[in-house]
Amino acid sequence: GSEVTEKAGFTADATITSGLGLHDVTVAEHALALILAAARRLDTAVRAVDEQRWAKELSVNQPLNNATSFTIVRGSRIVIWGFGGIGQRLAGYLKALGVEVIGVARSAGERGGFPVITADDLPAALETADVLVNILPASPETAGVVNAELLAHLPAKAWLVNVGRGATVDAQALTAALRAGTLAGAALGATAVG
């Protein structure tokens, strides 16, 4: 991301270019894969195969809607925080699967046919979300913004999918929410590095 370039100490006359849009497709597809894996509990299924057992917990009494558990993508409500190129591409994929998508960006309105809210309205949107997808870049303003206060707005059945920078997620708050059962799961494409 640009944060690495900014910290590199280049002189003011150095030319810096952008790869804007270069990874939109691959990151959006990765986010989609994580969402589908969360809904279908592929982690549990793979573990069962490794243990050479039938994953009874995945085949008996699964809800046919998302009222108590996020198990079906169609009809779910997914909030995408970071609604630039990657977020809008992901929104298109999700719309094709029958998902209600809400984008979160610096300014509210509509982008690509999707409703977009600001971070000020994010807590209210999370109250009924099945998934929060974080695609935020790392910056002083975004450091640790996915914190305990924000996670508390998600229902206990919800998942966090992070394909944004790891530094945007408060790892201790996420771990605490998962251990307390106030968040159903997390699919992390990125984590903070030491």
Cite the ranges covered by each PLM segment.
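An N-terminal-biased, well-structured beta-alpha scaffold segment characteristic
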Residues: G1-T17, N147
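Short, polar loop motifs at secondary-structure junctions
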Residues: G1-T5, G103-E110
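Phosphate-binding beta-alpha-beta segment of Rossmann-like dinucleotide-binding domains, i.e.
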Residues: A14, G19-R77
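Residues at the starts of beta-strands that form the adenosine-phosphate
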Residues: R77, A91, V99-E100
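Conserved N-terminal Rossmann-fold NAD(P)-binding element of oxidoreductases
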Residues: I78-G82
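Hydrophobic/small residue at the entry helix of a nucleotide-binding pocket
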Residues: I86
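Gly/Ala-rich phosphate-binding loop of Rossmann-like dinucleotide-binding domains
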Residues: A91, K95, L178-R179
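Rossmann-like adenosine-cofactor binding region
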Residues: S107-G194
